[in-house]
A protein has these predicted regions:
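Metal-dependent de-N-acetylase/amidase catalytic core
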Residues: 1-160
């Protein structure tokens, strides 16, 4: 709720007309919550979403939406743009080993679609839960997909 209020104020104060956010895809719970907050800001500016990574179909998918609706813009990156993307990702030193699967050939975005935030982004194992059987694994997060949905549903801005 605090993040929503802060972003809303920044949008209004700075006269921001466009916002980009991660897709609701189960890649990371923070990304999914950011998508929900951005959806609630659609009345203040135009909002676009971009896919990062998901585990739909029990396969790692990058830079592609789980469901295509025809409004997607796909940008094929040239060699210079791919190099820039690689250098940009190297800023995240803590994620160096985690980002090797990212598709460097394209970027994709579309107007933010309306999701059912009361249920996980897709059936099956979400990306951030794929190692959940191994509690000792460093990439395991304790949040269940329904816990994230319940946090969204119980937020003050859910029914706004």
């Amino acid at each position: 709720d605090k993040s929503y209020c802060l972003l809303k104020q920044i949008i209004l104060d700075k006269n921001i007309d466009t916002l980009f956010c991660p897709a609701y895809e189960g890649g990371h719970q923070d990304h999914d919550v950011a998508n929900f907050i951005s959806f609630k800001l659609k009345s203040y500016c135009e909002v676009f979403e971009f896919p990062e990574y998901n585990f739909h179909g029990q396969v790692i998918n990058t830079n592609t939406f789980i469901e295509i609706n025809g409004s997607e813009v796909v940008l094929d990156l040239d060699k210079e743009q791919r190099l820039f993307k690689t250098k940009s990702m190297s800023v995240y030193k803590s994620e160096k080993q985690n980002l090797k699967y990212i598709n460097l050939k394209q970027e994709c975005f579309r107007p933010l679609k309306h999701y059912d935030y009361t249920s996980p982004p897709h059936d099956g194992i979400l990306f951030y839960r794929r190692y959940s059987l191994f509690s000792w694994h460093p990439r395991v997060d304790d949040n269940s997909p329904m816990e994230i949905c319940n946090e969204i549903i119980n937020s003050k801005i859910f029914d706004k």
